[in-house]
Amino acid sequence: MAKKVKAIVKLQLPAGKATPAPPVGPALGQHGVPIMNFVKEYNEKTAHLAGQIIPVVVTIYEDRSFTFVLKTPPAADLLRRAAGIEKGAADPKRQKVGRVTREQIREIAQLKMPDLNARDLEAAMRMIEGTARSMGIEVVG
């Protein structure tokens, strides 16, 4: 018989630098998960992605064991990196804070494809372009 799921927790943590401090400790501690085990495993699996924010979905079972699935970095994070900016525009309709090329959009869409509900690369690119527009990033080329 399969283990009974107690909770599912979604977190966004820096790759290779998770600590038992908030938000990890309180989120997992309230479900009785051994926090240090999670932190150690997460940091091992994400060490090669240092500097990025990696979303993780932690499934916690009744016996206090857990499994987790790593997702791709948020599109906004990847766009900020590609455009070389710190943060998006406060008023994206009037203010443009950076530029990305269609080729950069294609690369981001290919990376994000497993986590997007798009059937093909073109649809994924349109989603990423929409995110860029909402951040005040201009898509050129």
Curated annotation (Swiss-Prot):
One of its GO terms (biological process) is translation. GO terms for cellular component: cytosolic large ribosomal subunit. InterPro entries: Ribosomal_uL11 (IPR000911), Ribosomal_uL11_bac-typ (IPR006519), Ribosomal_uL11_C (IPR020783), Ribosomal_uL11_C_sf (IPR036769), Ribosomal_uL11_CS (IPR020785), Ribosomal_uL11_N (IPR020784), Ribosomal_uL11_N_sf (IPR036796). Pfam families: Ribosomal_L11 (PF00298), Ribosomal_L11_N (PF03946). CDD domains: Ribosomal_L11. Disulfide bonds: none annotated. GO terms for molecular function: large ribosomal subunit rRNA binding; structural constituent of ribosome. The keyword Ligase does not apply. Keywords: Methylation, Ribonucleoprotein, Ribosomal protein, RNA-binding, rRNA-binding. It comes from the Bacteria. HAMAP family: Ribosomal_uL11. Part of the ribosomal stalk of the 50S ribosomal subunit. Interacts with L10 and the large rRNA to form the base of the stalk. L10 forms an elongated spine to which L12 dimers bind in a sequential fashion forming a multimeric L10(L12)X complex. Belongs to the universal ribosomal protein uL11 family. PANTHER family: 60S RIBOSOMAL PROTEIN L12, LARGE RIBOSOMAL SUBUNIT PROTEIN UL11M. This is Large ribosomal subunit protein uL11. It comes from Thermomicrobium roseum (strain ATCC 27502 / DSM 5159 / P-2).
